[in-house]
Design a protein with these regions (language model features):
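Ligand-site clamp/hinge motif
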Residues: 113, 206, 233-281, 413-416, ...
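Surface-exposed binding/hinge segments that line
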Residues: 146-197
Length: 573
């Protein structure tokens, strides 16, 4: 017998929690370094097949800022707020919701629970929050983003359980600074004086003793790159104690290998990117539970705006006009979740109240005739080889994604065939680590992956701001973390109107007005940028054995491990 749960998220409110960029590179990535080792089942552990295996554990760094890293490390590092599946905030370390204490200057005060402590029994205090803030703002540290933190002019520790943040101006999404999985509070007493860029790459531990350290229900017991990460209960956790003996994450980065490992009992749980026919495969496994919901992850087609050809906005508009997004939805994601549909917004998901179909200016089914007319008017002439050319530049581009992801590979094929009809040649060029190397090194031309949205789009400002264009560095250098950069504007687009609207949204406290501002941002992106074309809102797909109970998917960046302390496990032997 199997059990299936198909759900559509409850409606998001206009102003709520953040999706830090973990979101960003996070859910976007499908495959990390592929392991040659076959996963081995452990009857005393829950074994999870991980599509994206973390290269490092420090989730604040660009190299570690992936959703799988967040789902693995997140249960070890508590945050001010826990982000719930309905996208509401629940105070976690905080004893209550942080409060606005003054409008001029804009000041927010937060109070900690008095019983919060680290796994070594040292109290977790406001000094740890201050240390985390200082670490993020230290220009020597490679952090994924400083957005929001850079609006704080003073961070005042009032007492061990109280701190105060004074902002340059009104900053509406202040909760977001302490709610994302990339904002787990850091232990000052073990990390002070350490090299942040290296200290937690291979362990979440006290660097002096190598003893695991944490403040959440689990601890990271061990990490073997490309092989496994093991997390175990934190015996000194101040909240509800976890009862699972341990959870072992192993890399299973190929779509077919993942379901085969699940069917063979080599792994007990999988949380794959959407794959064609995967729902039926999971449901066919005896004793399996399948769950799917429409989360904040959204698939998109990106064009690097500095590439010759793509530097012409008319070319980008023609491609947006031709893209058969409805066909992609029908063939790639519809069987995973019946509620899947074309996404016409980069700031809000389809079931969020502020959602407006701003990208419907481009027909969902794709219009080849209209796209050809745009290119004709822009002077791009069709050559004898069927490829358009202008001033010696051919409209011939590579299109990459994470190799081994059959759903994305099908999307590529659909796009390739359609764009051929408008004189645009697409050559597919994939790699397992394309996001961690090629994309961040700007060694790509076009690409398909997914960002993670949020109830309040502030968390993804770094995708759109011109000041969030990272330093261009060599792919090999990027992979090992030797680039001094932050931000995620990987299409290198500059749109001053977007910058102005985002700055205005940050200081607007009225949720209705903020929602309107972000829709204005989206309309600018759809008409005057056109580098990131939304395809669809991704359904989550979670499969697990019915020997595990208490599992509840969380479509935020926290993922399915968000309530790991509620899991129970009936060992198989």
């Amino acid at each position: 017998m199997h059990r299936t749960v198909i759900s559509k998220r409850s409606r998001w409110i206009a102003v709520s929690a953040v999706a830090t960029l973990v979101l960003a590179l996070s859910a976007s990535t499908v495959a990390g370094a592929a392991s040659k080792a076959k996963p081995t089942a452990d009857s005393q552990a829950i074994t999870v097949g991980a599509e994206e295996f973390p290269p490092v554990l420090n989730n604040l760094t660009p190299q570690g800022n992936g959703q799988w890293t967040a789902m693995i490390v997140g249960p070890a590092l508590a945050r001010g707020y826990k982000l719930l599946p309905d996208f509401s905030y629940e105070p976690w370390i905080f004893s209550e919701d942080c409060a606005v204490q003054s409008q001029e200057p804009f000041t927010v005060g937060c109070t900690l629970r008095p019983d919060v402590k680290w796994s070594d029994n040292v109290a977790l205090t406001a000094d740890d929050f201050k240390f985390t803030f200082d670490t993020i703002m230290n220009p020597k540290n490679n952090v994924i983003t400083r957005d929001g933190y850079d609006q704080v002019t003073a961070f005042n520790v009032i007492s061990p359980t109280e701190f105060q943040m004074v902002f340059k101006q009104v900053f509406a999404p202040y909760r977001d600074l302490w709610s994302g999985t990339a904002t787990g509070v850091l232990p000052k007493h073990v990390l002070e004086g350490q090299n942040f860029n290296k200290v937690w790459n291979k362990c979440i531990c006290d660097p002096k003793t190598r003893t695991p350290i944490g403040s959440g229900p689990m601890l990271v017991e061990s990490f073997t790159p490309d092989t496994q990460v093991t997390i175990v209960p934190n015996p000194n956790y101040w909240g509800k104690q976890a009862t699972v003996p341990k959870v072992v994450f192993v890399p299973v980065t190929d779509s077919n290998a993942e379901i085969n490992a699940f069917r063979a009992g080599e792994v007990d749980m999988i949380y794959p990117q959407n794959q064609i026919g995967l729902r039926k495969k999971i449901e066919s496994v005896e004793g399996a539970v399948y769950a799917s919901t429409l989360g904040p992850q959204w698939e998109h087609f990106d064009m690097l705006s500095t590439v010759p050809g793509f530097d012409d906005i008319e070319v980008r508009k023609a491609i947006a006009t031709a893209l058969p997004r409805q066909q992609i939805v029908e063939r790639v994601v519809k069987d995973a979740n019946d509620n899947a549909k074309v996404l016409h917004n980069t700031q809000w998901m389809t079931d969020q109240q502020p959602y407006q179909p701003n990208w419907s200016v481009y027909p969902a089914s794709g219009d080849v005739a209209a796209a050809n007319a745009i290119l004709d008017a822009a002077g791009w002439k069709l050559g004898s080889d069927g490829v358009r050319e202008k001033d010696g530049v051919k409209l011939s581009f590579t299109l990459g994604t994470t190799s081994g992801n059959q759903a994305r590979e099908l999307s590529q094929q659909i796009i390739q065939e359609q764009l051929k009809q408008i004189g645009v040649k697409i050559t597919i060029k994939n790699a397992p680590d394309i996001l961690e190397t090629k994309m961040v090194g700007f060694d790509y031309e076009s690409i398909i992956f997914a960002w993670v949205g949020s109830p309040d789009p502030f968390g993804n400002n770094i995708i759109w701001q011109s000041q969030s264009i990272p330093e261009k560095c060599a792919p090999a250098k990027a992979k090992v973390g030797n680039c001094d950069w932050s931000g995620a504007n990987y299409t290198r687009i500059v749109n001053p109107a977007v910058d102005q609207l985002l700055a205005q949204a940050n200081t607007e406290s009225d949720p209705v007005i903020r929602a309107s501002l972000y829709n204005q941002v989206d309309r600018q992106l759809a008409t005057n940028s056109v580098t990131v074309i939304p395809l669809f809102q991704k359904p989550t797909q979670l499969g697990y054995k019915n020997t595990i109970s208490g599992v509840r998917d969380n479509p935020t960046q926290d993922g399915f491990t968000w309530n790991i302390e509620d899991w129970t496990y009936l060992a198989t032997s």
